[in-house]
Amino acid sequence: MSLPSRQTAIIVNPPPPEYINTKKNGRLTNQLQYLQKVVLKDLWKHSFSWPFQRPVDAVKLQLPDYYTIIKNPMDLNTIKKRLENKYYAKASECIEDFNTMFSNCYLYNKPGDDIVLMAQALEKLFMQKLSQMPQEEQVVGVKERIKKGTQQNIAVSSAKEKSSPSATEKVFKQQEIPSVFPKTSISPLNVVQGASVNSSSQTAAQVTKGVKRKADTTTPATSAVKASSEFSPTFTEKSVALPPIKENMPKNVLPDSQQQYNVVKTVKVTEQLRHCSEILKEMLAKKHFSYAWPFYNPVDVNALGLHNYYDVVKNPMDLGTIKEKMDNQEYKDAYKFAADVRLMFMNCYKYNPPDHEVVTMARMLQDVFETHFSKIPIEPVESMPLCYIKTDITETTGRENTNEASSEGNSSDDSEDERVKRLAKLQEQLKAVHQQLQVLSQVPFRKLNKKKEKSKKEKKKEKVNNSNENPRKMCEQMRLKEKSKRNQPKKRKQQFIGLKSEDEDNAKPMNYDEKRQLSLNINKLPGDKLGRVVHIIQSREPSLSNSNPDEIEIDFETLKASTLRELEKYVSACLRKRPLKPPAKKIMMSKEELHSQKKQELEKRLLDVNNQLNSRKRQTKSDKTQPSKAVENVSRLSESSSSSSSSSESESSSSDLSSSDSSDSESEMFPKFTEVKPNDSPSKENVKKMKNECIPPEGRTGVTQIGYCVQDTTSANTTLVHQTTPSHVMPPNHHQLAFNYQELEHLQTVKNISPLQILPPSGDSEQLSNGITVMHPSGDSDTTMLESECQAPVQKDIKIKNADSWKSLGKPVKPSGVMKSSDELFNQFRKAAIEKEVKARTQELIRKHLEQNTKELKASQENQRDLGNGLTVESFSNKIQNKCSGEEQKEHQQSSEAQDKSKLWLLKDRDLARQKEQERRRREAMVGTIDMTLQSDIMTMFENNFD
């Protein structure tokens, strides 16, 4: 065809490929039907398919060398006609035509051309549709007879073809038939002999011209020759042996092997065989074409001149035959498939010398096969489905009956029947075993479901009961449950693992503060309780179940929410047990009994305190060391009142305090406080409180200063504003009112009175600078002068009786403040603040007047007194002030140091928590990453050691 066109310099298109099967062995299978209706239809509709919809027009496109390079042209229109006329006997032939079309495009054109990109897009769509094709190829219908009209048309057309001048066709056929010889002579198989010299020289020249043209434009010559050798029409036509059409043949005529083939065809394809088909597709892929092409088709002995091939190789094998057997499902398992592939390679190694090029190709392809075959999963026998066994049993028993009827006298048929019977028995046994396994596997699931339902019902009942019980009883139940859980055997614990998953789903996740508090609480636990903590974590966290309980690292971020909640319950229960430590008898007591016992204890303590106070009152003048013990008793009283946990208990204790001996308690409550001696060095706390509360002006005696202290405290607790009283109006035993301020504050906290109500006024710090004066006999004139000045603002209804004054002091200690609401407390606090401001103003006025008077007194006294009369009031007050300020500074330093230490501990805890969080995040980030530098270092070390 192309030789005369080159000689005359005229480009002539060859006739299109044939689409009518002259051998009449075409079939219509489900896979071919899918290729026609789905694959071809979608490819035809694609926007890039227009260059492939008809044969290449070399005349129109001015491609004189196209048909010299492309020996087997193909297009979508030819494939469509072949599918319509049932040209193909199986789907693999049609798929081969599609691949030929794409390969022709890649072979002739450059890699970056537009037509190549269009072909790649079409091929991608083709492979996607091909993956959805049915796995098993089955004949759809019986072969239809060709109508007479069509036969006549075919005969007329064939007659026309014969009568027409067919010079070009003859030349094309002559070139087509011997084209195998030069191709194989150029290929690595240098074993061709006995070919005709003329035809080989002509075709060799033709191929070399095409190769030169191809080398100038697209790719090297070797790839062109190899690709053209694959798709030569004579090579494929001679090598492909179509399977016989078994539909038209009766079953009784077929031999035993073909009957066996029919039995296997109905069996489902296993997972291993699917992997084998994928391996076969991989070996036939284009990326392995350079070393796999000699094994695509059977060895053509006549074309290659290998007359002794079948003498050496007894069982020839190739990839085309293996693919055909795989399509026909002749392989029962993956090992038979592997045996055929290895047989193909062994034949190559056996016939060719070791240094031959084909042997190296075979080794490369075998490496590909072995690597993929080693990755096939191993299928257990029990994994076969029941439907597979049932179909096999029915088919084999049916064939057994037919075989018995058809082969009564033949010994070969008898052996076949025995084999089928054994197979049926084995499959029945396998079915029975499989059913037993299913029954056994379903039994524990039912038991677990029943246990789950029972446990759910029990949980609901427990919740209803627990809602009505006391919290102490709930704690007892928790303890009993924990003991029972410890005593349970391991098997019982394993059964409850399924129930924990429900708790895990319902558990509320913890925030950062809760986790931090939980870690602090765990650190507070004693050593004997930590074992239970480790047990809870290991039982609920499978990742930590195998860890060493003696040395375990716990990251709260990795623990489940249910585990954290369980730990929180256990730790809180343990911490509740530790401070209480109640005896066994008191556990079962009710609230009323507990309240009654506490009341009795408080009453006893109050009686003891009252008795001691009475004794202290008698002995105050004689013995001055006793009041310190009374202070201790008062502190015991305050501790007993503050130890009551609930509000009802505090009410009962306060009511007892107020109700017992109204006259005695009011008259004896405050005489119990100690007398302040001028020469005694006050303690740090007393100095601090007196600094904040006692506000004496200059020149006043110790008696008036004590009156200031008492009136400040009473005005802070009550709504009445009491001004300072003169010294001659004070009761005779009011010098005992210089009490310990700390104990008063403690009593007020016991009575739940807000601590803001007992704060000193704002002007106290300024008034402290005046100091505390000491009583001396020369101060009579001072007191008389102060009386006249202080009487004007103090003219209010103040009774002088002792009982009334003590009642006014005892009022703020009453428990009425406990029952007040928050609004009343706020109003009371506001009133107290207003009264403090008014009082501060009045005191400021009094202080100014006193300062003026003291200045005048100092001026007169300096003139009258001598320099050696001793220390003045001012110098003594300055000394006391210096002492107080020094002690206050020490206290301030100690408190600041304690605060700094607590802040440092908090900062350390925060830093530790922050570092742990950063470390955890870093570990999480490093889990999914690969350290390439580390990998490279390992590789270099390995190479150095290897060398």
Swiss-Prot record:
Q: What sections of the sequence does the record tag as coiled-coil?
A: 417-470, 591-621
Q: How is it modified after translation?
A: Ubiquitinated in a SPOP-dependent manner, leading to proteasomal degradation.
Sites where Phosphoserine occurs are at: 187
- The answer to whether the entry has keyword Ubl conjugation is yes
Q: Which UniProt keywords apply?
A: Activator, Bromodomain, Chromatin regulator, Coiled coil, Differentiation, Disease variant, Meiosis, mRNA processing, mRNA splicing, Nucleus, Phosphoprotein, Repeat, Spermatogenesis, Transcription, Transcription regulation, Ubl conjugation
Q: Where do the Bromo domain residues begin and end?
A: 27-133, 267-376
Placement of sequence motif Nuclear localization signal: 209-220
Q: Where does JQ1 bind?
A: 109
> Residue spans with biased composition (Polar residues)?
217-228
Task: Give an example GO cellular component term for this record.
Answer: nucleus
Q: Outcome of mutating residue 928 to D, per the record?
A: In SPGF21; uncertain significance; no effect on protein expression
**Which stretches are tagged as biased composition: Low complexity?**
637-662
Regions of compositional bias (Basic and acidic residues) in chain numbering: 470-481, 674-692, 885-924
Task: Return one Gene Ontology term, BP aspect.
Answer: regulation of RNA splicing
Quote the tissue specificity entry. Answer: Testis-specific. A 3-fold higher expression is seen in adult testis than in embryo testis. Expression seems to be correlated with histone H4 hyperacetylation during the haploid phase of spermatogenesis (spermiogenesis). No expression, or very low expression is seen in patients' testes with abnormal spermatogenesis. Expressed in cancers such as non-small cell lung cancer and squamous cell carcinomas of the head and neck as well as of esophagus, but not in melanoma or in cancers of the colon, breast, kidney and bladder.
Q: Where is the NET domain?
A: 500-582
PROSITE patterns listed in its UniProt record: BROMODOMAIN_1, BROMODOMAIN_2, NET
Q: Which InterPro entries match?
A: BRD4_CDT (IPR031354), Bromo_Brdt_I (IPR043508), Bromo_Brdt_II (IPR043509), Bromo_chromatin_reader (IPR050935), Bromodomain (IPR001487), Bromodomain-like_sf (IPR036427), Bromodomain_CS (IPR018359), NET_dom (IPR027353)
Q: Which family does it belong to?
A: Belongs to the BET family.
Q: What else is known?
A: BRDT is a promising target for male contraception. Inhibition by thienodiazepine inhibitor (+)-JQ1 that binds Asn-109, prevents recognition of acetylated histone H4, causing a complete and reversible contraceptive effect in male mice.
Task: Sum up the protein's function in the record's words.
Answer: Testis-specific chromatin protein that specifically binds histone H4 acetylated at 'Lys-5' and 'Lys-8' (H4K5ac and H4K8ac, respectively) and plays a key role in spermatogenesis. Required in late pachytene spermatocytes: plays a role in meiotic and post-meiotic cells by binding to acetylated histones at the promoter of specific meiotic and post-meiotic genes, facilitating their activation at the appropriate time. In the post-meiotic phase of spermatogenesis, binds to hyperacetylated histones and participates in their general removal from DNA.
Q: Quaternary structure per UniProt?
A: Interacts with mRNA splicing machinery proteins SRSF2, DDX5, HNRNPK and TARDBP. Interacts with the acetylated N-terminus of histone H1, H2, H3 and H4. Interacts with P-TEFb components CDK9 and CCNT1/cyclin-T1. Interacts with SMARCE1. Interacts with the acetylated N-terminus of histone H1.4, H2A, H2B, H3 and H4.
List the protein's name.
Bromodomain testis-specific protein
The lineage is: Eukaryota, Metazoa, Chordata, Craniata, Vertebrata
Q: Which gene encodes it?
A: BRDT
